[in-house]
Structure formats: structure tokens, C-alpha cells
Amino acid sequence: MALKSLIEYIARSLVDHPDHVDVKEIEGEKTTILELRVAEDDLGKVIGRHGRTAKAMRTVINAAATKENKRAVLEILEADHPEGQQL
């Protein structure tokens, strides 16, 4: 699915350290989970004021996933954060 590349493109456009952007896609039968990891300095840029940027990214990927009768979940994580700990 193109969701991974879509989120990578959006995130790299927003951050100061695009080389630290990493997206992991976990596909299920009806749901796709996208784990977006960015540098600690860029976390605020990706989340946005009051979470508006994160909400907008979630809206875009859900619209794209709906075309394929799926649901998408975006988790935003700190790049150096241990695996499994969501912010």
C-alpha cells in the first residue's frame, strides 16, 4: 500500500532532520498500523499545535485507506525511543 510512502513524504517535508524519519508499516487483514519515528527535536513539528498536524496526517491516511476498504492507524514515536513505548 502507498500509505507508508505517503506518510514518509509528509513527515520529511515537515521536519528539520528528514534523514531521521522512519516509517514501519504493519498490515493486518482490515487495519494497517503505521509507526512514524522522528528525531526528538522534530516531534513537535510532526504533532503540531494541539495535535493538529498529527490529526491532519491521520485524516489523510484514513481517506487513502478507506479507498481500499481498510482502516489506518498512525502512531508517532520518538526515533531513539525503545521499541514499543508510544508517546
What kind of region is each of these model predictions?
Residues M1-L43, K55-L87:
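RNA-contacting regions in translation and RNA-metabolism proteins
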